[in-house]
C-alpha cells in the first residue's frame, strides 16, 4: 500500500514539473521558429536556443503560421461627440457642485456697492419696544407682579 501511494505522489509531481517540456519550444519573432538539435533541409538556423539547441526557421514561410492583422487606423476626424447637454450640466463630475454659484463673503449687515466693489456697513434700525409688545398676556402673571425686562435690568444693578 505504501509503494502504491509513493507511486501516485511521484506521478503527480512529475506531471506538474514537466508540463512545459512536452511541446516543442518556440523561438524568434512571434514564435515562428522551433528549437531543435539539427535543422531540417527546408529550415535555416538563425540563433541558438537554450541547452545547445538551434532556432530553426523555415526558409519559405508556411501558411500554418498566421500573422496578426494590423490594427485598424482610427481617424480622429471621424469621432464625434454629442454636445447637446453641455448647457444643462455646469457642475463637476466628481462633486456634482455647480460652478456657477458664488458664495456671499459679506458679513451680516454689510452690502456690496457695485460702483467701488467695497463692503458698506449698515446698522439695522432700532425697534422701540413697549411692555405690551414684549410681554404676552397670560392668565397667571399680571403686569403689576412682573415688570418689563427693561425695568428689571435697571432695578437689579
Swiss-Prot record:
Query: In the UniProt record, does the keyword Lyase occur?
Result: no
Q: Which cellular component appears as one GO term in the record?
A: extracellular region
Its subcellular locations are: Secreted
Q: Where is this region: Disordered?
A: 109-157
Query: GO biological process: any one?
Result: innate immune response
Q: Which controlled-vocabulary keywords does the entry list?
A: Antibiotic, Antimicrobial, Defensin, Disulfide bond, Secreted, Signal
Signal sequence: where?
A: 1-20
Known role: Has antibacterial activity.
Q: Please state which protein family the record places this protein in.
A: Belongs to the beta-defensin family.
Q: What is this protein called?
A: Beta-defensin 125
Species whose genome carries this gene:
Gorilla gorilla gorilla (Western lowland gorilla)
